[in-house]
């Protein structure tokens, strides 16, 4: 239990499932204070210049969300049980925390920002970051949370707009693990395996290498992405930066929602032409098939945790600045006290980023992509002390090299089904690189 305002509130639920031994996990004594503040400016403009790209955190959509800086605590894990280890660690932190929260809203009090690798055997594993300072906005309400360890809070501060970040200099892009032509050949091979009955769908990703003459400032990327892609969740956690249109799971007071995207077409910039393309996307048997696999996998994963799950009969077309997606919002009422992170673990990897059947598609990805996805297509987001939170899928993103911040890897992927055309899939992947490429070269 921990103190919130003048109330004693139970901390994270304790599922009955067996957890890894927690004896080796240190339990820090965390203290947090949340107060209401006047709106200090656009959230992303408050992020200060720091010693490295991993020192800022953000989760913002249309001006609302959370930003943080500094590190009061951090946790890393790897392996198949990385989600369980992270959940156990956060629960132990919350159990021993002393919190004064004047608002008691989702995202107030102590918050952990997190990102998780796509693959269980990736060395990138899991990272949870608890910033020293968090500023949040929800509607007209704004708040400041300061967090410290061993009863030491950061000194009093008033959030203010920071000097603007600098643009990257002399940005250069080059092929990653595979060239475009090589990746197209991999897609053709995957289609052959699908037509042979090995699987129904596989999501194949590719990467681009980025080199610059200066350190890449995640604040620059965040601000450029937010300006152009206001219908996405703009994020940075531990040097991973992007703008995802796909909410893996949002949990608030027992209601869980998940936005599923699968099926994509590139926009032309001509409104009339784009409306016609949207109509064709909504009728495309190839894209509808791909979308159905993704929706079914999310609904099946949520069902054991919920008393009911609502799945709309047909998807809608989500219009972004550069592409359009088939989208479905799945919702349910959670009855087993699962946290947002536990639900994210149940959903990952969904058919939207892996394929169908998932175990077979996962093996095919390892064989065909010839790279480690790192945290691309893994869960990214935040969780508060109650277990509520928001976890997106790390899409339209890149990872800044912690050893050399002038370097970065960008990622994009496409769902491959029996009707996929390699050249069209390559063009789609190029379109999905556009948000990060444009953000890097906007200066």
Where on the chain are the PLM-derived regions?
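A residue-level signal for conserved active-site and pocket-lining positions in enzyme catalytic cores
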Residues: 114, 135, 197, 249, ...
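Conserved hydrophobic core element of enzyme catalytic domains
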Residues: 330-443
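Short beta-strand scaffold segments in enzyme catalytic cores
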Residues: 133-135, 234, 241, 246-248, ...
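A short glycine-rich, hydrophobically flanked beta-strand micro-motif that places a catalytic Asp/Glu
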Residues: 55-57, 112-116, 233-238, 373-381
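Non-catalytic accessory segments adjacent to catalytic cores
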Residues: 2-11, 89-209, 305-308, 441
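Cytosolic ligand/metal-binding cores
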Residues: 2-32, 37, 138-161, 250-329, ...
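An N-terminal JmjN-like helical accessory module and its immediate linker preceding a catalytic domain
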Residues: 2-81
């Amino acid at each position: 239990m921990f103190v919130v305002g003048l109330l004693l509130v139970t901390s994270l639920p304790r599922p009955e499932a067996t957890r890894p031994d927690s004896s080796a996990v240190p339990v820090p004594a965390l203290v947090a204070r949340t107060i209401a503040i006047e709106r200090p400016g656009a959230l992303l403009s408050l992020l200060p210049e720091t010693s490295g790209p991993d020192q800022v955190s953000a989760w913002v959509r249309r001006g609302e969300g959370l930003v943080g800086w500094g590190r009061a605590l951090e946790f890393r894990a790897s392996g198949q049980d990385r989600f369980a280890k992270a959940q156990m660690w956060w629960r132990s932190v919350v159990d021993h925390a002393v919190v004064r929260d004047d608002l008691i809203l989702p995202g107030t009090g102590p918050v952990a920002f997190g990102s998780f690798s796509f693959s269980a055997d990736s060395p990138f594993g899991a990272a949870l970051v608890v910033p020293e300072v968090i500023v949040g906005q929800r509607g007209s309400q704004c708040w400041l949370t300061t967090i410290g360890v061993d009863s030491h809070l950061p000194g009093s501060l008033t959030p203010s707009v920071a000097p603007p970040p600098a643009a990257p200099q002399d940005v250069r892009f080059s092929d990653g693990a595979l060239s475009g032509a090589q990746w197209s050949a991999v897609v053709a091979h995957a289609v052959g395996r699908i037509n042979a009955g090995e699987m129904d769908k596989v999501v194949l990703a590719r990467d681009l290498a980025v080199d610059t003459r200066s350190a890449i400032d995640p604040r620059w990327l965040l601000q450029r992405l937010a300006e152009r892609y206001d219908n996405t969740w703009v994020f940075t956690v531990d040097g991973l930066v992007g703008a995802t249109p796909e909410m893996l799971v949002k949990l608030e007071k027992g209601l869980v929602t998940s936005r599923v995207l699968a099926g994509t077409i590139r926009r032309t910039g001509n409104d009339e032409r784009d409306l016609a393309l949207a109509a064709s996307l909504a009728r495309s048997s190839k894209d509808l098939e791909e979308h159905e696999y993704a929706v079914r996998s999310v609904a099946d994963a949520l069902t054991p945790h919920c008393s009911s799950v609502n799945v709309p009969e047909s998807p809608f077309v989500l219009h972004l600045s550069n592409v359009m997606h088939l989208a479905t919002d799945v919702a349910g009422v959670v009855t087993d006290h699962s946290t947002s992170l536990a639900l994210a673990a149940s959903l990952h990897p969904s058919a939207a980023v892996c394929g169908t059947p998932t175990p077979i598609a996962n093996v095919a990805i390892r064989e065909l992509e010839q790279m480690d996805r790192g945290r691309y297509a893994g869960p990214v987001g935040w969780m508060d002390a109650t277990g509520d939170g928001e976890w997106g899928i790390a899409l339209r993103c890149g990872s800044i090299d912690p050893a050399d911040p002038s370097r970065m890897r960008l990622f994009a992927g496409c769902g491959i089904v029996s009707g996929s055309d390699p050249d069209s899939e390559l063009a789609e992947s190029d379109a999905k690189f556009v948000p990060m490429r444009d953000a890097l070269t906007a200066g």
